[in-house]
């Protein structure tokens, strides 16, 4: 057959059909505000919660289960009562969760296990670093000098500043 014959032409069979219409939910919120952060209402609940600093996907699933919220629903589809319950739970610092799931265990001052979110987490991490600097611990000294803190090698990686290149020996 020739290249231009009718048998090789692709025909769009769906051209006359209309696209299935999406149901418009009047209560749907495209932006949900939790812990001073706007979350995308079109994401699933646990994944939307993971956009908050201090909450990961696993903790998002656990929070949804604890509050009996559907994990297969988008966060924008939740009712206002459910969202209020979610806000209260997320913004609380102490949780009834296993210690290994929290992000600030055995806090130095109170000894409590906390899960901090958003700016609270950022402030607490900075305070912890300042405490390490103040007591002159090894990690604090490394932070002061701007060096790597967690045992990484520093000979070849993590160099700052401009590269000079290879310097030749003068003849």
Swiss-Prot record:
Biased composition (Basic residues): 144-158
Protein family according to the UniProt entry: Belongs to the universal ribosomal protein uS13 family.
GO biological process: translation
Keywords associated with the record: Ribonucleoprotein, Ribosomal protein, RNA-binding, rRNA-binding
InterPro entries found in the cross-reference section: Rbsml_uS13_C, Ribosomal_uS13, Ribosomal_uS13-like_H2TH, Ribosomal_uS13_archaeal, Ribosomal_uS13_CS
Residue spans of biased composition, Polar residues class: 1-11
Subunit structure: Part of the 30S ribosomal subunit. Forms a loose heterodimer with protein S19. Forms two bridges to the 50S subunit in the 70S ribosome.
PANTHER family, per database record: 30S RIBOSOMAL PROTEIN S13/40S RIBOSOMAL PROTEIN S18, SMALL RIBOSOMAL SUBUNIT PROTEIN US13
This protein's GO CC annotations: cytosol; small ribosomal subunit
Disordered: region residues: 1-24, 144-164
UniProt entry tagged with the keyword Glycosyltransferase: no
Entry's Gene Ontology molecular function annotations: rRNA binding; structural constituent of ribosome
Endpoints of the signal sequence: none
Record function comment: Located at the top of the head of the 30S subunit, it contacts several helices of the 16S rRNA. In the 70S ribosome it contacts the 23S rRNA (bridge B1a) and protein L5 of the 50S subunit (bridge B1b), connecting the 2 subunits; these bridges are implicated in subunit movement.
Gene3D superfamilies reported for this sequence: 1.10.8.50, 30s ribosomal protein s13, domain 2
The keyword Metal-binding appears for this protein: no
Pfam families named among the record's database cross-references: Ribosomal_S13 (PF00416)
Protein known as: Small ribosomal subunit protein uS13
Species of provenance: Thermoplasma acidophilum (strain ATCC 25905 / DSM 1728 / JCM 9062 / NBRC 15155 / AMRC-C165)
